Amino acid sequence: MNFSESFKLSGLLCRFSPDGKYLASCVQYRLVIRDVTTLQILQLYTCLDQIQHIEWSADSLFILCAMYRRGLVQVWSLEQPEWHCKIDEGSAGLVASCWSPDGRHILNTTEFHLRITVWSLCTKSVSYIKYPKACQQGLTFTRDGRYLALAERRDCRDYVSIFVCSDWQLLRHFDTDTQDLTGIEWAPNGCVLAAWDTCLEYKVLLYSLDGRLLSAYCAYEWSLGIKSVAWSPSSQFLAIGSYDGKVRLLNHVTWKMITEFGHPATINNPKTVVYKEAEKSPLLGLGHLSFPPPRAMAGALSTSESKYEIASGPVSLQTLKPVADRANPRMGVGMLAFSSDSYFLASRNDNVPNAVWIWDIQKLKLFVVLEHMSPVRSFQWDPQQPRLAICTGGSKVYLWSPAGCVSVQVPGEGDFPVLGLCWHLSGDSLALLSKDHFCLCFLETKERVGTAYEQRDGMPRT
């Protein structure tokens, strides 16, 4: 495993292009485009204000920069650096901006969610979509880019509208039996739309493309309900994370629950492997010390290293007692993610914040638990294989695969708190994001990890 040098960064704004050739990063009002293989700067663009959001077009030919405070979006072209587009929403304001799947239209959501404006880069035409709902996840495209589903609120009722992305014509419009619709998401195959209600009302609704209600699911009543939702890449499973600390798995045939995964504070099953992060001190002989120390060694000396150890059961995990009289209590399953092959599901229970639970979806049982010394901030699966990257806000990155897990210190002068991460399309590298800097972590090839993956039913190794 190797690391690049660190580069300046603002607002954790660092994104790989969809084709994997470029890396975009922001420094205040400047947009920097680098070649992924050499990390040499290819283009440097200057925006009119500090950038708050960036997004690549699906074909990697354009990139948009949103400046919400100014109500501005600027679009840059990689093929024609002298060309650029400026979209000014004026007094309507701007709270969100995204590409359409064709990479030639931009959807801007105005302040107070009064409307969505669809701007065409080719024809310069403008279309308007009324009544978008201000909710957690109110806009979703099918993977093939043909349809847009939009959550709406009008006349004190929730609705969903489905638009054809080729001409933005309304295809279907139907109301949802929800008190306060919180989110919608298409299944990866684009055949089913999941819609879920506010946390005060446990309800998941599943609709077909033509707006027919396929199924409604409610696990319990009179308590805080849904906190997170995730589709498996195969579209066979819908995972629902709840405030009661459980993940419920619905199947795609009957849309009934096939199992539920609990997140207890104590692991009693002796067959469950629990890795605990533990500190280790670097052993440096006097004969090997140099002054001044090399850059990589200086970073290692400034921060203690750590390793994973297999804990013997029963294992008690660190827990938080949620504050019951405040909104958004730190409890329940707040993070869910399936591996790219749909074999594994990773989850975090927010009142056991230091632990990541990894479930074997084929066998519908707990596979491993990873407990860290600090609360888990983020985790993300390798796009090509079952390998999970985790960060906790410290100067380490953690990697797990079915063959085992490792804690890696990020080298460098001073501290490098890893606040976020994102995988390259190939899975060969990983961008580690800090408050003011980012660097790339280069990993071993898929073939070597794949060999270890074939042994996944055996005892994991550290």
Swiss-Prot record:
The modification Phosphoserine is found at S281. It is found in: Cytoplasm; Cytoplasm, Cytoskeleton, Microtubule organizing center, Centrosome. SMART domains: WD40. Keywords: Cilium biogenesis/degradation, Cytoplasm, Cytoskeleton, Phosphoprotein, Repeat, WD repeat. Pfam families: WD40. Ubiquitous. GO terms for biological process: cell projection organization; mitotic spindle assembly; positive regulation of non-motile cilium assembly. InterPro entries: Centrosome-WD_assoc (IPR052778), Quino_amine_DH_bsu (IPR011044), WD40/YVTN_repeat-like_dom_sf (IPR015943), WD40_rpt (IPR001680). The SSX2IP:WRAP73 complex is proposed to act as regulator of spindle anchoring at the mitotic centrosome. Required for the centrosomal localization of SSX2IP and normal mitotic bipolar spindle morphology. Required for the targeting of centriole satellite proteins to centrosomes such as of PCM1, SSX2IP, CEP290 and PIBF1/CEP90. Required for ciliogenesis and involved in the removal of the CEP97:CCP110 complex from the mother centriole. Interacts with SSX2IP. PANTHER family: WD REPEAT PROTEIN 8-RELATED, WD REPEAT-CONTAINING PROTEIN WRAP73. This is WD repeat-containing protein WRAP73. It comes from Mus musculus (Mouse). The lineage of its organism: Eukaryota, Metazoa, Chordata, Craniata, Vertebrata.
